[in-house]
């Protein structure tokens, strides 16, 4: 699976749950919460991840919504495990874009059966997700960077492609006007980003990362994001199910 057009209404019946979860998350941020707007930039760009097991509304959406079943079909996987949740909130007038990046290089997950759902909780057009078609097939992964400092995440830069500028380089960029609860489904290897939010309304987005049958733990040349300290997994192992529970299994 690479990029699928909008999965219309995937979280439509859970919008209020997600809004409540986002509000709780912002009132009580987790250890990985970050404000991504630097000095001199306007607005606020808050993100946080790995909170589903302490915010009941997120857990409800993951366990009860059709997302895991849809993911199994997209990945052609018999089973689905949760990897992590992520919220990204851009206040009105935020100039900071979401930097172009692939998720895969940040993760300690190897395999092709994976999917990320990105779903807005507000109507979006200009501030929607943007994906570069075919980028999951590039010969090397794109260099992971820190969003604020914009420096390299790992020391071995030669193993990665430099972060491109898809607009300037004429790449095929796909983006969608989306209603609350719609979702874009894409592979961890897809290069993606988003513009700043220059509108007068908030842009709240919920993202859910799921993995399938072939997902295995892989060592990276430095701390990953999320880091999941103390996981005690070894290369080639299925991700431990007490931390990354199975949320769907196709009936035999």
Question: What spans do the regions from the language model cover?
Answer:
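Double-stranded beta-helix
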Residues: 124-191
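Short, solvent-exposed loop/turn segments at secondary-structure junctions
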Residues: 4, 87-90, 105, 123-124, ...
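Sequence context surrounding c-type heme c attachment/ligation sites in exported
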Residues: 1
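Non-heme Fe(II)/2-oxoglutarate
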Residues: 21-26, 32, 37-40, 142-147, ...
